[in-house]
């Protein structure tokens, strides 16, 4: 698997990813995307990420959408979810943006308890309504909760108590 913002993804990359059976995580924060995800010139990157998703769809690359749940995303989850559905994204992962454990300061973009609760309850209601109507969209967190509920093991390490080694290349090359 590989994680990307998709900005440099083109047909050549898509063919490579498909041929080598990569699962791609594409960072996309929907309608809130351009608030925090800027390019080197300070411009929002939402249009480019959507372009990357279309390229991957065209070439049959398997990909998931990874959304960072900021306070803005949480408060606008209905619009965010509808945007994801409209774009026919079928595999969604939501990653909560929490304050650092060693910092008492709250940042404007991090989630408070009330925002996160609203996000989870609202998203579950929207997802469940679609599920009951025969329109299944995979939301990793809910898929893992279901697995635990039926006595299976969650595949998400934060829910299973055991994580595999993951290699990361930071933005500065480390």
Question: Could you describe each region identified by the protein language model?
Answer:
Residues 96-99, 146:
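Residue-level detector of flexible, active-site-proximal loop/helix-junction positions
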């Amino acid at each position: 698997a590989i994680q990307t913002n998709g900005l440099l993804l083109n047909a050549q990359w898509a063919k490579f990813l498909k041929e080598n059976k990569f699962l791609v995580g594409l960072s996309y924060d929907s309608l809130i995307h351009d608030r925090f995800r800027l390019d080197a010139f300070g411009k929002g990157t939402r249009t480019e990420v959507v372009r990357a998703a279309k390229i991957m769809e065209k070439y049959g690359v398997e990909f998931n959408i990874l959304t960072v749940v900021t306070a803005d995303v949480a408060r606008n989850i209905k619009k965010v979810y509808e945007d994801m559905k409209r774009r026919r994204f079928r595999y969604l992962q939501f990653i909560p943006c929490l304050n650092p454990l060693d910092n008492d300061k709250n940042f404007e973009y991090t989630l408070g308890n009330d925002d996160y609760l609203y996000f989870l309850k609202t998203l579950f209601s929207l997802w469940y309504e679609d599920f009951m109507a025969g329109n299944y969209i995979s939301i990793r967190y809910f898929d893992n909760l279901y697995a635990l509920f039926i006595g299976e093991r969650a595949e998400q390490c934060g829910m299973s108590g055991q994580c595999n080694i993951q290699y990361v290349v930071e933005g500065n090359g480390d």
